[in-house]
């Protein structure tokens, strides 16, 4: 299936490939390539499809630089260049570049990082650059595919003393650092008859002639000289098995780039194809381990298949399905982005806020990540939070970040921060979804200590007060902490709102622990804090909250995006919440790309200063704003979620994005991305907004479902949500003016609706599927409800069999069959039949509509 945005000023197509949504676009429309990672590495690519770097999470350094492939005529050595425009396929698991060479050969280069639990592929610090050559011409084609790799990168890299050691089995170049010989890189191929060499001349990659010893005799007639080694523009050192270390007398490598080179000569028959791969990788422990990793990765087809399957698996959890395919894709890609950055550092599980540039793991980001990650991989959330527990200060403060490699901790000398309450909230959220009592018992002392510390920072008014008098990270205790020469200290509304929610949350954990007195204490402190916030931090002139009341008692009435925090954390009254949402929903704040951090009409607005924190657009703030609108204005929530993800899909050339990747921040006027191409903590916020905002999931003392449907929607669904060791699926729809909810797990709701609790999700027993049709089948052996939703922009029909349900699941007997038609908002009774006579259904579906098919066993 292929989709495109009508009237869009770009050529991005949307396709379903390998059971996931992917993007297809001309290869001249990217300004940067995709990014992929696993537990031990992260790799970026360029707009050309070349690998840009391989970053080791164990070292926190780039270990291999750019890797690319060039093509030459095998007899003359003349460079064969791309002809015409090619295509990129941007898939959650890989990036494929398809193009033609001068002779009409069709090339596919595929870049991916192995990421699957089988054989610990997700712990292999390596990247593939695969190659498929198809000959559609009328002649046998002989070409040389030559891959080059920078084995001594300098940007954020190890010490520049990597040396080439030898070529293992004549197809893998081995290099290691002189100062740390255990740090071993490999650059190899699965192709037969490879020739390995290296050079210190970076111009080799740009040479229009492929000059190797086997071509010496024929090069003269092409370059017009009596060819000899002295005339060669690039000097290579050939490598053989177990060669000695680099001979500096033969080729001086001191302080010079080292370019590994692997040549594969290929003869492609008419109508035939050749396929193999190049692999770059690293071991922080030994050359032997590096070679074992390479040999594991040689089965590249299996690694490719398992990596795709793993992404399909990761995205199968908490599937949010709505009539709006843009939001559906956004949720899928959010989970795919998260799967690329979940890592295992020397210090433990976590993720950096700046992949391939930093190893710092921020508590704030980890907390927000867990709110979304809990709906996909709660075990990762647990392990990531446990690291912060281990590094917690003696007084209870949670530091701003730790370094995942060294374990160094920095709290920026703040007396209070947003990290501490967010850590508490994250631990509680993870416990609520997992019901893991071992995790609770391990983490409760830490969160209670953190809560006690929060309370200790109250001032005489009962407000949480930051006494740090610095600027930037040393004087801003909230999330916008990297604004230079700026302070947000004292009583900060953002942090106070988070602390209220944290104290209320830790009271809940105290209840579970049977610590009744502590629970009552935390609950009372939370109530007092909320009252103090609404007494001292509301601006009587505007009815909105102050940004902060600083160390000198000055009230800062700045209206910024931070107004969302009292709404999100239930500090604001309904009336104040409506006032805040209305203010943020105005054009000087809200754009098609997201929410400006400071309104365009403010005196201190600037579209890009301070990393966009004084007027730029941070999409994750828009996700939080969308969540805050969920119960007040769901139509606004949906428009924001749709618009922000479309910004990630459309026009990557002008917006400096990669389709499907959640980039960081935009210029407040041009809406062009100025930040990182994949911001790790944005995707989980989008997922969190979809699950808790759109689908209305709440975890407080049990499962609550209160969907927030905009006026234009008739249904919404959530499938396979992890909860207390089970998988929750529900379908909610408007039936005769009432929102009916069908679910396979006991739940409560505050809506005036009909609840139908069934035992099992038996959707897998219906095998017919259409990409634009959503189907959920929930049942007990005597009661089956099949829910079918239309996601297309037109009316459609769908035919499917239920024979496996009626023959293997349902209790034998007579069943009344009813069908609900959304277009007429009424049920149609199809009579009573024996289950053996119920074989299938064919339904018509209106735009955005649904059908319910109910089979109820009759009592005789």
Language-model features: where?
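Short Pro-Gly-centered flexible turn/kink motifs
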Residues: 141-144, 185, 265-289, 846-855
């Amino acid at each position: 299936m292929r989709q495109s945005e009508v009237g869009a000023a770009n050529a991005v197509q949307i396709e379903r490939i390998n059971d996931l949504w992917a993007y297809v676009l001309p290869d001249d429309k990217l300004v940067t390539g995709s990014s992929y990672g696993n537990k031990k590495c992260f790799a970026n690519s360029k707009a050309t499809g070349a690998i840009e770097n391989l970053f080791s999470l164990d070292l926190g350094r780039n270990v291999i630089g750019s890797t690319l492939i060039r093509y030459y005529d095998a007899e003359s050595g003349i460079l064969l260049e791309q002809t015409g425009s090619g295509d990129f396929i941007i898939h959650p698991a890989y990036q494929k570049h398809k193009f033609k060479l001068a002779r009409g050969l069709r090339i596919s280069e595929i870049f991916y990082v192995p990421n699957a639990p089988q054989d610990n592929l997700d712990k292999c610090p390596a990247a593939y650059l695969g190659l498929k050559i198809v000959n559609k011409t009328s002649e046998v084609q002989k070409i040389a595919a030559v891959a080059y790799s920078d084995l001594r990168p300098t940007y954020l890299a190890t010490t520049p003393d990597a040396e080439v050691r030898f070529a293992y089995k004549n197809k893998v170049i081995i290099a290691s650092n002189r100062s740390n010989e255990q740090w071993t890189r490999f650059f190899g191929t699965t192709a037969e008859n490879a020739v390995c060499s290296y050079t210190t001349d970076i111009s080799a990659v740009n040479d229009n002639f492929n000059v190797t010893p086997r071509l010496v005799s024929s090069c003269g007639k092409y370059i017009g000289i009596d060819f000899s080694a002295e005339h060669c523009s690039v000097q290579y050192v050939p490598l053989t098995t177990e060669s000695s270390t680099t001979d500096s007398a033969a080729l001086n490598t001191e302080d010079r780039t080292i370019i590994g080179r692997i040549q594969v000569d290929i003869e492609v028959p008419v109508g035939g194809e050749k396929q193999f791969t190049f692999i770059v990788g690293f071991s922080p422990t030994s050359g032997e381990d590096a070679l074992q990793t390479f040999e594991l990765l040689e089965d590249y087809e299996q690694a490719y298949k398992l990596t795709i399957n793993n992404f399909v698996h990761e995205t199968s959890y908490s599937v949010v399905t709505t009539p709006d395919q843009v939001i559906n894709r956004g949720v899928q890609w959010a989970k795919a982005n998260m799967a690329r950055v979940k890592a295992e550092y020397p210090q433990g599980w976590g993720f950096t806020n700046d992949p391939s540039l930093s190893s710092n793991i921020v508590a704030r980001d980890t907390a927000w990540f867990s709110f979304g990650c809990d709906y996909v991989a709660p075990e990762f959330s647990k392990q990531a939070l446990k690291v912060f527990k281990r590094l917690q200060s003696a007084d209870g403060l949670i530091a701003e970040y730790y370094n995942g490699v060294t374990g160094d901790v920095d709290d920026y000398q703040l007396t209070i921060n947003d990290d501490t309450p967010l850590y508490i909230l994250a631990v509680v959220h993870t416990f609520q979804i997992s019901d893991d009592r071992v995790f609770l018992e391990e983490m409760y002392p830490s969160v209670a200590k953190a809560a006690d510390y929060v309370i200790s920072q109250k001032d005489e008014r009962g407000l949480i007060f930051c006494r740090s008098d610095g600027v930037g990270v040393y004087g801003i205790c909230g999330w916008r902490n990297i604004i230079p020469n700026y302070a947000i200290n004292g009583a900060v509304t953002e942090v106070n709102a988070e602390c209220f929610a944290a104290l209320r949350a830790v009271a809940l954990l105290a209840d579970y622990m049977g610590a009744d007195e502590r629970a009552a204490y935390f609950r009372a402190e939370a109530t007092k804090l909320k009252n103090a916030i609404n007494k001292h931090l509301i601006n009587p002139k505007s009815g909105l909250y102050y940004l902060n009341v600083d160390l000198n008692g000055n009230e800062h009435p700045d209206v910024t995006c931070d107004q969302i925090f009292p709404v999100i954390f239930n500090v604001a009254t309904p009336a104040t919440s409506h006032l805040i949402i209305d203010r943020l929903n105005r054009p000087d704040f809200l754009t098609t790309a997201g929410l400006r951090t400071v309104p365009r009409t403010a005196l201190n607005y600037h579209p890009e200063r301070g990393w966009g924190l004084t007027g730029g657009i941070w999409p994750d703030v828009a996700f939080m704003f969308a969540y805050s609108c969920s119960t007040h204005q769901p139509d606004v929530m949906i428009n924001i979620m749709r618009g922000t993800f479309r910004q990630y899909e459309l026009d990557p050339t002008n917006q400096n994005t990669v389709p499907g990747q959640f980039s960081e921040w935009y210029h407040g006027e041009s809406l062009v991305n100025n930040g990182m191409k994949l911001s790790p903590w944005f995707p989980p916020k989008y997922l969190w907004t979809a699950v808790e905002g759109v689908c209305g999931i709440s975890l407080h003392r049990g499962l609550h479902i209160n969907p927030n449907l905009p006026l234009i929607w008739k249904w919404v669904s959530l499938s396979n949500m992890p909860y207390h060791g089970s998988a929750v699926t529900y379908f909610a729809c408007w039936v005769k003016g009432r929102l009916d909810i069908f679910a396979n797990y006991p739940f409560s709701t505050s809506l005036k609706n009909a609840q139908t609790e069934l035992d099992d999700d038996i959707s897998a027993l219906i095998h017919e599927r259409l990409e634009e049709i959503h189907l959920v089948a929930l049942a007990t052996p005597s009661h089956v409800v099949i829910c079918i939703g239309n996601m297309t922009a037109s009316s459609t029909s769908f035919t499917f069999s239920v024979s496996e349900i009626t023959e293997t699941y349902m209790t034998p007997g007579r069943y009344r069959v009813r069908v609900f038609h959304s277009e007429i908002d009424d049920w149609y009774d199809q009579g009573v039949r024996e289950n053996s006579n119920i074989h299938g259904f064919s339904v018509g579906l209106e735009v955005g509509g649904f059908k319910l098919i109910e089979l109820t066993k009759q009592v005789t």
